[in-house]
């Protein structure tokens, strides 16, 4: 991934902190199952590693999340509301939990 993103001389700290941030998002809500697309499995595996190491040091504190993949292979990547690419905050084609019902319906 470092080569793919062309991080030659320096690697942004956000790149290294992202797995910790995602693990915090999952563990803060004590998620037992995490529905993800196949492309997100490495991130969830890292989360599971973080949980295991944390629990080894501090006792059984965090919940170890189970990866739940879609049963339909056609849904391995959730399409964005633009219908072009996978749903992503950075592409601006996602639905937020804070979106109003009318806005969500507008995207259907």
Regions found by a protein language model. Give the residues of each.
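Active-site cores that bind ATP or allylic diphosphates and position pyrophosphate for catalysis
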Residues: 2-108
């Amino acid at each position: 991934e470092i080569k793919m993103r062309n991080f030659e001389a320096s690697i942004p700290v956000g790149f290294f902190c992202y797995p910790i941030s995602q693990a915090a998002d999952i563990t803060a809500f004590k998620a037992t199952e995490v529905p993800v697309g196949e492309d997100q499995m490495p991130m969830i595996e890292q989360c599971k590693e973080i949980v295991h190491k944390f629990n080894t040091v501090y006792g059984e504190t965090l919940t170890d999340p189970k990866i739940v993949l879609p049963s339909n292979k056609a849904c391995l990547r959730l399409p964005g509301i633009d219908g072009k690419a996978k749903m992503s905050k950075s592409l601006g084609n996602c639905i937020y939990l804070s979106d109003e019902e009318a806005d969500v319906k507008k995207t259907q």
